[in-house]
C-alpha cells in the first residue's frame, strides 16, 4: 500500500507565502484522497506492488488513461511538488542547472518569463513543469492538464508548480499570476531541482 508522505518541512514552514491552512486542505485532504483512492483501485489487481512510476506509465495507456491513472499521477505529482519547495526558497539556480537554463532558454530571466507564462496559461486544472529530455539532452517547459506529467512523454521532471485552484485559492483567490510569482521568488528549491538534474544526467 502507498502511504501519504508528509512534506519535507513543517506545515507552517512556507508561511506567509503558502499558509498552513492551504496545507491542511491541499496535503491533508486532496493529496490524502488521491493516495487512499489509488490504494482502493489497485488492491488485488496486477498493479498491486508496482511502483507509482510504473503504475503511471502502464495506466496512461498511450493517452487513453485507465481508471487508476489519475489518482496514481496526482499522488506522484503532489509529492514532487512539495519537494520542489523549501522555506526561504527562490533566488537563482547555480552550477550546471544555470548553465543549461542559459543554454536552452537564452537566460535565467527568459526562462522565468516562459515558466510563468506556461503556468498562467494552462487552462483549467493542471501543472507546469521544467523537464529534461534525455534523448535530446535538453531542458524543456511542459504544461499538462489535470493529472498528466512529463513521465508519460519519456521526460524527466525537474520542477513543477500545481495550478489546480485548490493549490492557491485560500491564499490568493483567483490571482493565479501572483501565486506563480511568489512560487518562483520565495518558494522554489533550486537545490532539489539541481539534484534531480544530476540524477537525470548521471
Curated annotation (Swiss-Prot):
It comes from the Eukaryota. Induction: By environmental conditions. Binds 1 Fe cation per subunit. The keyword Metal-binding applies. SUPFAM superfamilies: Fe,Mn superoxide dismutase (SOD), C-terminal domain (SSF54719), Fe,Mn superoxide dismutase (SOD), N-terminal domain (SSF46609). Its EC number is 1.15.1.1. Keywords: Chloroplast, Iron, Metal-binding, Oxidoreductase, Plastid. It is found in: Plastid, Chloroplast. Its cofactor is Fe cation. Its main location: plastid. It catalyses: 2 superoxide + 2 H(+) = H2O2 + O2. One of its GO terms (molecular function) is superoxide dismutase activity. Homodimer. Destroys superoxide anion radicals which are normally produced within the cells and which are toxic to biological systems. This is Superoxide dismutase [Fe], chloroplastic. The gene is SODB.
